[in-house]
């Protein structure tokens, strides 16, 4: 049976007090709506229909690369009205999941369970038991079966004591949506078209409404203001850290870790405090990440140790490598096994061979460095001429003295030595010594200028 996902994302988000549409507010490094779209794709939905309104152009531009049908809700007249807008493009057969752009963390497994129970009756929903149901629609049951959903403003005093609430997440056959949605009425306290009224229509048709509860309550929590956004962020990060610990990761403090993407981990990985992982990363066995590090789209092989406050973006790091503290690896950095990258060393678009070292205050950009070479403190590859980037090639077992400038394009042959303080503009032959510096001048008995006493 084909699955359509309908995402309601037209709200203004006034309480956010932001020029950014609410569904574009970031959570764990991804827009709220992006989380919902990701889940829809995990479900292999044939159709994803997103209803937009406030800031629609911005929203559509943000997700321009996604295969989405966009439907405008020019006037926000309720959730039922929003779903009515999809009828011209909604398939006649199959089922639809109705989700929300500001309820970002409902999980694939939960929705798969909802689909399964809904297939038996043609309609199902997610409900939740809460201690304080104020403001939420109540689930009214008779003999255990759902009879209606009553919005808080329309509820009687007795109904307001009910602690089972409507999350707004439904799975409904498309045939029934085409039948029920045109019948919705706005004769209620809010003057809106409630999607919840389809429950009463299902009961009137003699259908039993299936329901499930989420394993984790935060899955169905919505975001209306920045306080709720921050609270949901922390709940989500707590859950992600828990799942990583179950996979064998040791955290110095799981409350001080942020995962803003995905990470694959080996055995016995250790992560210190205030580490941020973004994009898609992979950490091998026995990898250690020091305090305050940021990793983005990076792979680090087994046994590597990263010291504090190092930043990685698009890097590939080999086994048993030592990095940091305060190192920066930029896109295209590829380090072989047993490499040493020390404090205040920046590596960009550079391959570094087995066992090579750059331990202090160095910039290596657009370079290829062989095995067992040593790059002295203060060395830079001068790769940019103001218009184009040029390559520096350094062979195996090369020794580059401190404070050297290698002006690309230039090649340093295997076994060569470059004297400290040199500006190398020509190729250096294998097993040779090259140095370039002005003659030292010394003046005896030199008197420095003195400040005049006031």
From Swiss-Prot:
Its main location: cytoplasm. GO terms for molecular function: glucosamine-1-phosphate N-acetyltransferase activity; magnesium ion binding; UDP-N-acetylglucosamine diphosphorylase activity. Residues 248-454 are annotated as: N-acetyltransferase. One of its GO terms (cellular component) is membrane. Mg(2+) binds at residues 102, 224. The keyword Cell cycle does not apply. Residues 1-226 are annotated as: Pyrophosphorylase. The active site is at residue 360. GO terms for biological process: cell morphogenesis; cell wall organization; lipid A biosynthetic process; peptidoglycan biosynthetic process; regulation of cell shape; UDP-N-acetylglucosamine biosynthetic process. Residues 227-247 are annotated as: Linker. Pathway: Nucleotide-sugar biosynthesis; UDP-N-acetyl-alpha-D-glucosamine biosynthesis; N-acetyl-alpha-D-glucosamine 1-phosphate from alpha-D-glucosamine 6-phosphate (route II): step 2/2; Nucleotide-sugar biosynthesis; UDP-N-acetyl-alpha-D-glucosamine biosynthesis; UDP-N-acetyl-alpha-D-glucosamine from N-acetyl-alpha-D-glucosamine 1-phosphate: step 1/1; Bacterial outer membrane biogenesis; LPS lipid A biosynthesis. CDD domains: GT2_GlmU_N_bac, LbH_GlmU_C. It comes from the Bacteria. It is found in: Cytoplasm. Acetyl-CoA binds at residues 377, 383-384, 402, 420, 437. The keyword ATP-binding does not apply. It catalyses: alpha-D-glucosamine 1-phosphate + acetyl-CoA = N-acetyl-alpha-D-glucosamine 1-phosphate + CoA + H(+); N-acetyl-alpha-D-glucosamine 1-phosphate + UTP + H(+) = UDP-N-acetyl-alpha-D-glucosamine + diphosphate. Its EC number is 2.7.7.23, 2.3.1.157. Pfam families: Hexapep (PF00132), NTP_transf_3 (PF12804). UDP-N-acetyl-alpha-D-glucosamine binds at residues 8-11, 22, 73, 78-79, 100-102, 137, 151, 166, 224, 330, 348, 363, 374. In the N-terminal section; belongs to the N-acetylglucosamine-1-phosphate uridyltransferase family. In the C-terminal section; belongs to the transferase hexapeptide repeat family. Catalyzes the last two sequential reactions in the de novo biosynthetic pathway for UDP-N-acetylglucosamine (UDP-GlcNAc). The C-terminal domain catalyzes the transfer of acetyl group from acetyl coenzyme A to glucosamine-1-phosphate (GlcN-1-P) to produce N-acetylglucosamine-1-phosphate (GlcNAc-1-P), which is converted into UDP-GlcNAc by the transfer of uridine 5-monophosphate (from uridine 5-triphosphate), a reaction catalyzed by the N-terminal domain. HAMAP family: GlmU (MF_01631). Homotrimer. NCBIfam families: glmU, PRK14353.1. This is Bifunctional protein GlmU. It comes from Acinetobacter baumannii (strain ACICU).
